From Swiss-Prot:
Name listed for the protein in its UniProt record: Integration host factor subunit alpha
Phenotype upon changing residue 8 to C: In IR4; altered DNA-binding specificity
NCBIfam families: himA, PRK00285.1
Gene name, Swiss-Prot/TrEMBL: ihfA
Protein source organism: Rhodobacter capsulatus
Keyword presence, Transcription: yes
Any Pfam family matching the protein: Bac_DNA_binding
């Protein structure tokens, strides 16, 4: 497994090389796309990117949890969590890479 992490800079550099926009325009494009995705998720909307996956926000109810050190029961408050569900194509690509 690779230790490499894909960053915003990597994405904007790829747009610069492959699309032909200037470096500034490429960085601005990446930032704009990420901002639109973030804004939609904050509003509770689902972000679906075909052949990639779906980002969604789920509401979790309050429940009782347990402190692993003491075993004491502690209440866990309700919260919103972000989840990602990869598309079947993405799952297949990752599995194919693992098979090599």
């Amino acid at each position: 497994m690779s230790e490499k992490t894909l960053t915003r800079m990597d994405l904007s550099e790829a747009v610069f090389r492959e699309v032909g926009l200037s470096r500034n325009e490429s960085a601005q494009l990446v930032e704009t796309v990420l901002q639109h995705m973030s804004d939609a998720l904050v509003r509770g909307e689902t972000v679906k990117i075909s052949s990639f996956g779906t980002f969604s926000v789920r509401d979790k109810t309050s429940r009782m949890g347990r402190n692993p050190k003491t075993g004491e029961e502690v209440p866990i408050s309700p919260r919103r969590v972000l989840s990602f569900r990869p598309s079947h194509l993405m799952k297949d690509r990752v599995a194919e890479r693992n098979a090599k």
